[in-house]
Amino acid sequence: GSEMCIRDRIRDVQKLAVENSRLGIPLLFGMDVIHGYETIFPIPLGLSCTWDMAAIRESARIAAIEASADGISWTFSPMVDISRDPRWGRTLECYGEEPYLIAALGTEMVNGIQSQGVAATLKHYAVYSVPKGGRDGNCRTDPHVAPRELHELFLYPFKKVIQNSHPMGVMSSYNDWDGVPVSASYYFLTELLREEYGFDGYVVSDSEAVEFVESKHHVADTYDEAVRQVLEAG
């Protein structure tokens, strides 16, 4: 449907939540908003080719204004994964393969989005962009990413953007690292993200990441056990 339809639907549901629920707590509506909302800008890979930090920040600001007008206060953007495998189908959503450039662009995206009171969410934390066989949705990281490569390449953009622009959110990915699901990893979600990087926002799991702890990684016997592991990880 049209954006007007989306706006009307969000308004109706929000009104119901505020006026007809016991506590009257507003709902939080989120959307990807990767490269624009009503105004469509170039794909992230195209934006990165400009090296124009001011223009990239402005594109994020405009997208946030438009999304906010529809009642959306939460974006699943920016995506600061590093593209290292050309077979991977989400390369176009990345800013390329250079960690420093990705961190710089991610910082500007967060600044632009959050300047309008809309939450930015860094994704996908972490080591999401090298799935086995380059097949998106595959929960196994392949090839094995060594610790030095992990920290100097894949985690660098997350660390820098968090310290430079303080995004409100981080999305935990559904893949593993060294045999441990990232979304159930205390090392990734607490020791690195909060204690070392200083992140103080919320963590949201990627689609089915909690379920996959049981169904694909097989490190939990039940879904309830998977939920427990994820919550205790951070």
Predicted regions and their residues:
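Glycoside hydrolase catalytic-domain context in secreted enzymes
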Residues: G1-G234
